[in-house]
């Protein structure tokens, strides 16, 4: 699935507010909607994955730099049993950007109680102009007659990124290396799962797929046409999704939204929990 911002374009047109093209105009749009009693942005922050993906998505540009990839390689190393915390190069800035985003969108403790139905209900009723969600939401609302588009994360450095999450992940038993027959069977299953036919079958109607297999052509529905350039620039961030990241993101980001932690305190708290 592909995540970013689901946007009610008709609301923008109704109130003559320009669609966002960068972070500054995104913030301006949020402020303009607030003046007419509409939430510019919200999301279902009762869920751990929304907390986690917002934190990472806002810093996708920085997390994919050389330093960011270096940290991620160390954190995700399957051969290492040592606990790895956050680095002191890339991650402090990620919490600064999260804190800035919270201020700019006026997120509060009330948003922590919002679930998916709450947020989509606000969007459907014209009470919220934008929310964090998947491109499937665009189809859902268009089918309901709401002029909806999909926009990327607007990084504060000017870049645009989208968040991707795997449909499935595969682990192969190391013992297969010693059993040729079983290994061949496992690879046959793997090849089928990664084939174009199989990937198109597992994709739900209206949902886009960005395949990591080079032999599967790019498939974008009309709902992603506004971020095609982002895809073509390969600005597709694959989320870090360890069990620790889910749990710690929920705890720390929730406290940031509630105003209980500064960016520095959040960085320290997150790091401490990863190392615990």
Name every feature range the model reports, one short phrase each.
Residues 1-10, 39-40, 154-163, 232-240:
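A structural signal for short loop-to-beta-strand junctions that line the ligand-binding cleft
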Residues 1-27, 38, 45-77, 164-174, ...:
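Periplasmic solute-binding protein
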Residues 13, 199-200, 228-276:
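Conserved C-terminal helix/tail region of periplasmic/extracytoplasmic solute-binding proteins
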Residues 14-19, 99-114, 127, 144-147:
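A local structural motif
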Residues 15, 142-205:
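Extracytoplasmic/periplasmic substrate-recognition and gating elements
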Residues 23-28, 109-124:
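Short helix-initiation/N-cap motifs at beta->coil->alpha
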Residues 30-32, 73-112:
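Glycine-centered hinge/linker elements that transmit conformational signals in sensory
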Residues 129-134, 149:
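Paired acidic/hydrophobic, glycine-rich loop segments that form the ligand-binding mouth/hinge
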């Amino acid at each position: 699935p592909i995540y970013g911002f689901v946007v009610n374009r008709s609301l923008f047109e109704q109130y003559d507010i320009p669609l966002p093209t960068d972070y500054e105009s995104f913030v301006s749009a949020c402020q303009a909607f607030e003046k007419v009693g509409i939430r510019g942005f919200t999301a279902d922050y009762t869920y751990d994955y929304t907390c986690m993906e917002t934190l990472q998505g806002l810093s996708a540009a920085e997390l994919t730099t050389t330093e960011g990839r270096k940290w991620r390689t160390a954190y995700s190393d399957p051969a290492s049993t040592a606990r790895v915390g956050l680095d002191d190069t890339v991650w402090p800035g990620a919490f600064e950007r999260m804190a800035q985003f919270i201020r700019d969108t006026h997120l509060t403790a009330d948003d922590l109680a919002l679930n998916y139905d709450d947020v989509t209900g606000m969007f459907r009723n014209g009470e919220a102009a934008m929310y964090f969600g998947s491109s499937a939401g665009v189809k859902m609302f268009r089918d309901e007659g709401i002029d909806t588009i999909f926009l990327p994360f607007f990084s504060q450095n000017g870049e645009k990124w989208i968040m991707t999450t795997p449909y499935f992940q595969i682990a192969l038993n190391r013992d297969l290396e010693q059993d040729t027959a079983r290994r061949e069977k496992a690879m046959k299953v793997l090849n089928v799962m990664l084939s174009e036919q199989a990937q198109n079958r597992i994709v739900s109607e209206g949902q886009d797929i960005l395949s990591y297999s080079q032999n599967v052509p790019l498939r974008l529905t009309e709902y992603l046409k506004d971020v095609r350039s982002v895809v073509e620039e390969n600005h597709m961030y694959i989320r870090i999704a360890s069990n620790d990241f889910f749990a710690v993101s929920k705890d720390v980001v929730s406290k940031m939204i509630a105003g209980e932690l500064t960016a520095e305190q959040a960085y320290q708290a997150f790091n401490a929990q990863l190392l615990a």
